[in-house]
Amino acid sequence: MAKAKFERTKPHVNIGTIGHVDHGKTTTTAAITKVLADAYPELNEAFAFDAIDKAPEEKERGITINISHVEYQTEKRHYAHVDAPGHADYIKNMITGAAQMDGAILVVAATDGPMPQTREHVLLARQVGVPYILVALNKCDMVDDEEIIELVEMEIRELLAEQDYDEEAPIIHISALKALEGDEKWTQSIIDLMQACDDSIPDPERETDKPFLMPIEDIFTITGRGTVVTGRVERGSLKVNEDVEIIGIREKATTTTVTGIEMFRKLLDYTEAGDNCGLLLRGVKREDVERGQVVVKPGAYTPHTEFEGSVYVLSKDEGGRHTPFFDNYRPQFYFRTTDVTGVVKLPEGTEMVMPGDNVDMSVTLIQPVAMDEGLRFAIREGSRTVGAGRVTKIIK
């Protein structure tokens, strides 16, 4: 009896390959799919190098990113794996979050050791909150000298420690190319790599386990019943008759009770992350709430006006600005469902930011927004998206 393709029963983990150009990220990805397809044919299919390397273009908030998605399973887990072939694609993906990672495989060629992009990728992974990194030391078939490998390992551990990653993380010696060719020793190295992923990348916290949060998209008045707010539940779950807080955009929060939950015209007892639903609010007038606010579990989230963010600025070709911007630039920041104007402060020594750059900036919003680290936003001028970023630090 053939097993079903996608089993919900296994933990689902998002993973990706990162590292310097030509160190073998895509070859490693291809090798993982081949070796697992051979080991567990009923669970996996192999993806050829060319299929992964010719990454399809994706549009994420108007930004073009070349990125490949493959999936595979070990006995323990179901993995969704992203591979961004180009350095620029990797940076755009990390900042815009086209693919969120629960853990990353840092691919380093034993022949070169850590290179500038290796460092940059690890730094960026830290900034955007990738929780765990382990290492695939690739091309080990080309290095005979054990001492060289030891030196490279020391360098990698220093690099991980610099960015507060686990310096005791597994470093697995592999040859992705030899594994693709079917060499027994190196095929085993890929099995070891996946075992290390299973053992060392922590199970991600599921969105449903976090406190309730639903951004308001629309507001209706139902005569005789009250006000209904609709949106997609981003986190957590909520039962009828629980209290909620409505925060953001306005100075003061509103506290109320949810007296009804509706989805697809049916009344529900409860709703959870991923559902599109309407919440009937007790004693709330239509003018008390607005789009852009969020409905949350009381006390679980706070609105903020000042933050630091990591931002990718769209190039002219991507429909972005044609000219640079400077300190005190005042665009709109689009969070979840609404735009809020903000003032940009550039880092010390940065005179201006050119289209196509990535930059860290601090922002002061004119209205508070419920946020925590990792929240994504778009930067807009009117209806045109000119940048994308994520919150790296809350200031106030």
From Swiss-Prot:
Q: How does it assemble?
A: Monomer.
Q: List every stretch annotated G1.
A: 19-26
User: Per the record's keyword annotation, is Hydrolase included, yes or no?
Assistant: yes
Q: Note the SS bond partners.
A: none
Q: What class of enzyme is it?
A: hydrolase
Gene transcribed to yield this protein: tuf
UniProt entry keywords in alphabetical sequence: Cytoplasm, Elongation factor, GTP-binding, Hydrolase, Magnesium, Metal-binding, Nucleotide-binding, Protein biosynthesis
Region annotated G2 sits at 62-66
Region G3: list its residue ranges.
83-86
Q: Which organism is it from?
A: Corynebacterium diphtheriae (strain ATCC 700971 / NCTC 13129 / Biotype gravis)
Query: Which domain of life does the protein's organism represent?
Result: Bacteria
Q: Report the coiled-coil segments.
A: none
Q: Which GO terms describe its cellular component?
A: cytosol
Name of protein: Elongation factor Tu
Where's it mainly located? cytoplasm
